[in-house]
Amino acid sequence: QKMPAVAMTDHANLMGAFHFVRDILAHNKSAAAKNKTAIENGEEPTEVPMKPIVGCEFFVCKDHKSKSNKDNGYQIPLIAKNKKGYHNLAKLSSAAYIDGFYYVPRIDKNILLQFKDDVIAFSGGLRGEVGDLILNVGEPQAEEAFLWWKEQFGDDFYVELLRHGLEEENRVNETLLKFCKLHNVKYFAAND
């Protein structure tokens, strides 16, 4: 199958983004050359260029500057929509390492709100805020968090559904699908 796009999300940094984009662009150059040769030979071109999608999975805690207790936060993947979004991911990553490093590089919702433009947010599966609240606290608190993400990111908030045969995933998926239907949020299959 020919994929039109491929994404990469490093944990808390964008260190692999340069090599990732470079390799996709090299693939696209090779695909274009092969398609040109096919056309010149009277054949149907079969190579498909790919779009590189750059993202970062952040540890989102209550206060990224606090070092009074270990709070690794929730794991939330963010995707750049464009160059400005990429720059915002880079700013978030820098803040995570410069100001928020305590066991892991962390950000919080306040700094996320400063750099959310042109960024897509995913719910984060079982280790995301909503999934964790469904499992460990309760549906009302999970729905409150769900609505916060929807309010902040609007149509750029997507829910991840995981299926590895785990009972926890089944429980979380059932509730997430209910929230998605109730609040008109899109979802997708993920494999975290």
Question: Which role does the model predict for each range below?
Answer:
Residues 1-191:
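Phosphodiester-processing cores and adjacent nucleic acid-binding clamps
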